[in-house]
Amino acid sequence: MVFGDLNERPLKKRRFFVDEEDTHPPSSEAAPVTTNLDTSTISSAGPEGSDVRQQQLNGAVPFPNVKESSRESPGLGPEDKQDNLLKEDEENNGTVDYEILNHSPSIHAQQDQRVDQGLTNGFGGQPSGERTVSETQAFQSSGGFDTSTFASIIGEHLSPESLEKIRKASGDDLERAVNIYFDGSWKSSNNSLSQPLVAPHQQTLSNPCTPVNESISQTVNTKISKKPNQAPSSRCLSQSSRYIGAFGVGAWATRSGVGLLKHGEHVNVERARSQPVSKRGRGGKLITNQKGDVLTRFTNKSGQEIGRLPRETAEWVSTLIDQKICRFEGICVFAPDRVRVNDTIYLQLWCYLRKEAFLPRNLWNMGDDNRSTAFFEEQESAEEKQLRLRQVALVKLFDEIGLQPTTVNDMTKKHKKEGLLRAAEIAEQYDKTKREGKSNESSEDEESPELEEDQLDTLYKKAQSFDFNMPEAQPPPSFVLNLRKYQRQALHWMLAKEKDKKSGRELSMHPLWEEYTWPTKDVDDKDLPAVEGQAHFYVNPYSGELSLDFPAQEQHCLGGILADEMGLGKTIEMLSLIHSHRNVSPSRQGPSSSTELVRMPSSSSAILPAPNTTLVVAPTSLLSQWESEAMKASEQGTMKVLMYYGVDKSTNLQELCSAGNPAAPNIIITSYGVVLSESRQLAMFNSNTQGGLFSVDFFRVILDEAHVIKNRRSKTARACYELRATHRWVLTGTPIVNRLEDLFSLVRFLQVEPWNNFSFWKTFITVPFESKDYVRALNVVQTVLEPLVLRRTKTMKTPEGEPLVPLPRRTIDIVEVELSEQEREIYDYIFTRAKRTFNDNIEAGTLLKSFSTIFAQILRLRQTCCHPILTRNKTIVADEEDAAATADAANELKDDMDLQELIDRFSASMENADTAEAQDPSAKFTTHALRQIQTESSGECPICSEEPMIDPAVTACWHSACKKCLEDYIRHQTDKGVPPRCFSCRAPVTSRDIFQVIRHQSPSSTPTETDLYSSTPASSPHPAPRISLRRIHPLSPSAHTSAKIHALINHLNRVPANTKSVVFSQFTSFLDLIGAQLTKAGISYVRLDGTMPQKARAEVLAEFNRTETFHQEEIDEDEGPDTPRVRISSKNSRSSPKSPAVLLISLRAGGVGLNLTAASNVFMMDPWWSFAIEAQAIDRVHRMGQLRDVSVTRFIVKDSIEGRMLRVQERKMNIAGSLGLRVGGDGSEDEKRKERIEELKLLFE
């Protein structure tokens, strides 16, 4: 028989065709169902009793009156029937192409497959092994197809050839023939049906991996790509499918009739899915917007739909069929003689694992196994959902047929099934919530709960149970620094981790995999054919993979997490490891683990080893620090360091780092941004970057400040996963920032099996945690941490009671700042508006939906506490700046003027006059007045008669008086409604034209307690300090100071000489304002923030640290026996007058990693929600190498939201449950919302 091509058949017509089954016709495919059967229906009809029939369903009693020909060799599928099938198809002239597809076939491929299935089975609905040639001929010559009726329905008379084509395609079914006509498939060409019939299950494969024909081989090569170093089998099943078990199911009828289905009759299973609506998301990822159809139908031998499988069973059976994992043969156990809609029909389904299930999947296109589960992700892609469904389907199938593993990991045995199903349930529930549009209200609740401070302590407990008797290791002579005892112990631990060869001692099964034995008897207790060399198969329930090869765990993690608290010298410890463990052999130690993560696609060019090179990846701000530390710690000529950043990226690393190159660098330093950039290029061009980071296999890779990759879904983290190295290390003071998933990303980078599989992680950590089984979850996390992490804190004490690191004392003071009257008015206005919004949302019940609006107003309040100008429109501020500059240019006055410059200007104007008569009298008076101010001989105040004047101030006409007297005088005249005039010359004056006399501290004198605005002369033998005139009410908005800036400068003026300070703020615009005021105050400073390129950052740090602010004698006095040697040249023994005294730095750019021990004063200008972030910044100064006591000042505005933020911090830190295992937001969703509302109420009290 020759049929038309069905490639163009509309989706809505697909219900008449079997879905992409290649080994059996629709008649031999059935989907499984649950064993929760309603046996009361069985007892009411049929000759057998309910007990016997239930035993038949469970496989205990064989079914009577079932043709033995249908299951002579169930273990091999339908191979035993191939002779009859071949004869039938030869007589029918049927042809077929067999194609192995991936689990996401195209529509055309699905339709082709349906035609193939129909050809293979004659469209009769009966198993091919039971149909004889005579039956087939009789079926084809049936007179049931009425051509006149068909023509009257379609309204057209067709040619005999077309009628014959449609009649054969429909199997003499008039209804199906009408559908075939209207969908137009009968007009398509039949080129795809021109090959002789070769069904895969009818071949005896001499080579298990050899395709049965040319088309199969081509399809496999083009549609299934082998994952590099993948554990799944390199062998294939020697037949198309193999029996693994059977189970019973209670289906339901969708039509009524008499004699539709009989006991013992074979049934067909059809998967008729509606195509889900999909679209391409970011990065080309396919996003499914509609829930897929899981309808699974069964038909009788005539092709009539009898009923459907219940949804709870069809959900996973459809997955196994669609993804070509299993096929099912169904037998009717019981059906009423007269079937009515919704009647229960009992079936027994025989399950066979298909050959395609053991083929490697193209995981690169669908995302790797860790990414693909998309736990708590915004949207689940189609590929990610397929993996989740595959996992659940396999677990439920094996549970249904009672198939138990013969070998399983002890750790996974107890909670595997519950964990996997619960993880899938959570993901499905989250997907449902997103579809229903509830994300706005509970988006943050859907995130995994945050860990409280006490929980983090619990997690770190084992890692921090440091053995002070641990052996020590001495670095080689090439390392010139002296290590403290705890650092030498760390070096011994790291060397032990890197040189551990435990994986080579014994061949053990990978912990993610389970071993199963192929059944030797079927459900009727009949022997199944044995296959030589294939007694077992292996399943990875966490990735859904199957294998016939033993999945060995070839290598475990040769690295770890160095999690010493900030400031304990992790960089120095790691440099000592680089010196101590170098690769002496140029040859590598074999290939990477077969179970390692999915690699990016690579070109034909080999990835070359770099056996002598360590790659260091660090934040941009730390690159120069790593370079300088590496050179300082190494004997000259023993360490070659390459900065791989910016223009230096032109280096070809494959050539430079090759084993035979004596100039190969020992250390390559690069940034996370460079890794991400080259990763994008690699993915974009589908090939290795020429000589880039991904073209070599490093000896060691180190991630500094590794909490940068805490988000496993971030592009930076995924790029770092792809770096190749024998040894992998992460350095971070905070392995867990606030969620358990933070640790997973580090574990995945380290390739710690089995924990680097996110499905496994979810099953044994996330799911128990979500289910409030905190003890089990956190115990497991401690088990993960213990062998991987070495963590010491500055608070640890030795057995002798001495501190682990003898650091100088650190004091933290909170200074309350009073806002000025104008600042308080602005703050109160914004606070009132924010509180009104808060109350309105409380009354409307929409508080959590308006989080972004409320937090935006909270941000404005915090900015007001720093400086009111931060809350204003930038365009308006810029216009006001221009207007102020224009006004100053008109009257030749500025907001801030140097007194000596004014005297010089007016003196020059008089000297340039030709004659004494030509000289301007006002200029002469001004010069005289300014000189009096300079020499402090201006006399008594003309208003209060105080002598000398208190805080002298001058008007624009250069007459002097006390500042307070002058301001009161102008205010008094203004209140009387009289235009203010100068008390001396009666010239018009305004409050904006009053200039305060500012006497700056001498740069070489010791500051006193003098206030910023005090004019009291400093008694000093040094030259007179600089004096400036500063407008009390500046015209320029940015020239206005604020209460916090005022307090900061007061504190800086009281800082002892030769002492440096670091000022942190999270607002870079606030740093701009602070910098302007420091310039006016004559305080030198440098600045570092995230907008600066790497070279500029390095220059700033070098300038700030270039001069030690203390004498060599001071170092010698303070240096203890365990203090690392520091080298200070004699030329830097004393401060340079031009050395910057202050470093302005943003909290984000400088909060981690930097070494700022040159300073001993820290000023935190604004609080952060978590004090841990502030503590990280403080530890940049209070760390190993600091020789002075550290003073920390936190500025908090009194009676403001900043004070309430501190209370929220304290409240969170003080909340603790039993056993220290309470999580933030613990409890129901309502309880979580109540907590958030309470915190907001606390902010708006």
Swiss-Prot record:
Task: Reply yes or no: does the keyword DNA repair apply.
Answer: yes
Its biological function? Probable helicase, member of the UBC2/RAD6 epistasis group. Functions with DNA repair protein RAD18 in error-free postreplication DNA repair. Involved in the maintenance of wild-type rates of instability of simple repetitive sequences such as poly(GT) repeats. Seems to be involved in maintaining a balance which acts in favor of error-prone non-homologous joining during DNA double-strand breaks repairs.
The protein's matches in InterPro entries, at most eight in alphabetical order, are given as:
Helicase_ATP-bd, Helicase_C-like, HIRAN, P-loop_NTPase, SNF2-like_sf, SNF2/RAD54-like_C, SNF2_N, SNF2_RAD54_helicase_TF
Q: Which GO terms describe its cellular component?
A: cytoplasm; nucleus
GO MF terms held by the record: ATP binding; ATP-dependent activity, acting on DNA; DNA binding; helicase activity; hydrolase activity, acting on acid anhydrides, in phosphorus-containing anhydrides; zinc ion binding
Protein name per the record: DNA repair protein rad5
The similarity comment for this entry is:
Belongs to the SNF2/RAD54 helicase family.
Q: What keywords are annotated for this sequence in UniProt?
A: ATP-binding, Cytoplasm, DNA damage, DNA repair, DNA-binding, Helicase, Hydrolase, Metal-binding, Nucleotide-binding, Nucleus, Zinc, Zinc-finger
Q: What is its EC number?
A: 3.6.4.-
Q: Compositional bias (Low complexity) spans? A: 1129-1138
Principal place of residence? cytoplasm
Record domain Helicase ATP-binding: where: 551-753
Q: Give the UniProt record's GO annotations in the biological process aspect.
A: DNA repair
Localisation per UniProt entry = Cytoplasm; Nucleus
Where is the stretch described as Disordered?
Answer: 1-85, 117-145, 430-454, 999-1024, 1110-1138
List all Basic and acidic residues biased stretches.
1-10, 430-441
Polar residues: compositionally biased ranges: 33-44, 129-145, 999-1013
User: Where is this chain compositionally biased, Acidic residues type?
Assistant: 442-454
Coordinates of motif DEAH box in the sequence?
Answer: 704-707
- Give one Pfam family: HIRAN
Q: Which CDD domains match?
A: DEXDc_SHPRH-like, SF2_C_SNF
Coiled-coil ranges (or none): none
